């Protein structure tokens, strides 16, 4: 989480104090404070795990940011979504050019030269409770036979399967999901497909907790940040790694059919 300086704490405290006489915050979980364009800008950020107590509401979480971050910088149109992700407990999954690519708003925070895929990656949606148990298939090494799964796009609002998780250890797993263009996903039609990524919950904020491992030669080029991994897979492609074989059996406009099988050590 970003470290909030003392001046920012003072700004939030005074703002809440002034508004408290007119606003009942008892049913509020998050608050966004938009500041004027001061000569010395207020640092943008989220309070993270440490919040404020107002109207009997403890751990009151706040995002602050200058007016320009909302309305005058097109490349920061996902800024509020990114900071709100922190309020909900998500960490940075930087650095995106070698790790999560452009597939999560917590990792592609400032990507202005290529399409930003401003949705949350499946693991983060699962963490937030946005995916039900029926939308996630979890497997571990006790499943030795080949399994088949029909994945639907992570950004499509439907009750269908969205995510496959392959447990590697107590802190590690492989995530498999389908990315298609949607309201939040600005991925180009030719770049759509299945991605596979490694999750390691022991890796600290900003150190690459999520890393795309499928099709590492597939990249996007960004003028500011260089190449970032794309990693999408289409019909007929397969991935071998971490003791698993994952193959895309078929794909259409609505779904991809994926087979998963353990690869026994020789």
Identify the function of each model-found stretch.
Residues 157-162, 190, 233, 240-242:
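Residues that act as N-cap/strand-start positions at coil-to-secondary-structure junctions
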Residues 25, 30, 38-187:
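Extracellular hydrolytic enzyme modules, especially secreted metalloproteases
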Residues 187-194:
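Short coil-to-beta strand junction motifs in C2/discoidin
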Residues 145-151, 164-166, 176, 196, ...:
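Hydrophobic beta-strand residues in large extracellular and virion-surface proteins
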Residues 1-80, 88-99, 198-266:
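Propeptide-to-catalytic entry region of secreted or membrane-anchored zinc metalloproteases
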Residues 173, 193, 254-257:
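A generic structural signal for beta-strand entry/edge sites
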